[in-house]
């Protein structure tokens, strides 16, 4: 018996030595694996601001309420009712969440911190919290189509939020903690690995100009009972987009009833036949060739022109017009006669060089190339109609970029949504400086009383631009629904801004671009020039405006 007792004692000592010394590290690791946990520490998503630092998107701290279902089911009835009430859900909904056999379940995401504190004070079994963030958009529907929004998991789903997801995201940190068997944190063990917050994205957008464009476009869409609309403001020196608005829009802070029509960034995604806003490009090609001058006379009588079996007509018959007057009075016949003086290749290359048929490459979702037919399939009638904006499709952003070539003395350049401290890249020359300036003079004529858009004039400033009025196509056929547009630039002597406006399906009488889109351009351009501190350059209009204020 003594020997047996001594043997047992020796075995116990040996086992203890093995456990305490030889296998200590292994056992300690197994033990720690049961109560040590690495917890991810969320990084804050980067802010999005306008060019002046005003907030467009910011992350606010919130809480996720989660549960270990098996433990949470031990809550009393009153505890469950209290938790459900704090989370603004029914007791039945809460019961269904914790009825699962899973070991983890989200009870509710993005709970306000003050609510989470009240829940924590209840010390409910199996109910836990983690920090997360919720995206907030201070400017709401005004900037929704540019900024976009994130989902509940803080990932970008639209706009800049999606396009710059990796830069905005940041990197989470971590900390090692001790939890009890119920999942409660007892203490921190390892020092915090700090999270790296996402980068701030500063847009080229100017919130004041954005608000101006939004309010004026909204008023016009409501006045004309239109289906939709869009407006863009571009700084021609840098290619920066100072404003981009669409209607209808939506509130990114409350997307419960968001529809596809509200979500569409129409200025980038919607294409349409532009109509007469294309005519200045045809005139520029003719001037650039040296075949005509602004004062060259074109016979537009009797206001009709037959090509094959098709007849092209002017809205109002004209007789003899100079090239400048063809643009000013928006003659289809005169424009077609200019266009048919060139082989299809030359006209196609010009349209391609100013960006038609190409995506604008802003880096945001939804950009389209629109439609510029391959030159190999151009017939005379196709070339004729494209010269005045039919048989070709464009987006509003393409028109804004294309008109920048006249503002930049014949050079085209890229557009950008992001503010850059670097000098803008050199442009690509499309037209000579002389041609660009001659077209600007014609565009200024178009807003005079004898032109098609006197309502687009801006008191105190010399401006120029072109109207567009085009039928819409539905089911492969033209219907009596209109797209009214106006694209212009100012100050005309040294343009700083291009403003493009489109109103989709105006009703109630007026539908011409000069009547519907022209006044919107006037308000947006005038307000933008004043916001940027650009001095008036038309003393005659300044005097007229001052005299008008003194009348009874």
Q: Where do the model's predicted regions map?
A:
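Beta-lactam-recognizing serine transpeptidase/beta-lactamase-like catalytic domain environment
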Residues: 57, 179-192, 231, 235-276, ...
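Periplasmic/cell-envelope proteins involved in peptidoglycan metabolism and beta-lactam response
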Residues: 1-255, 345-357, 473-477, 502-552
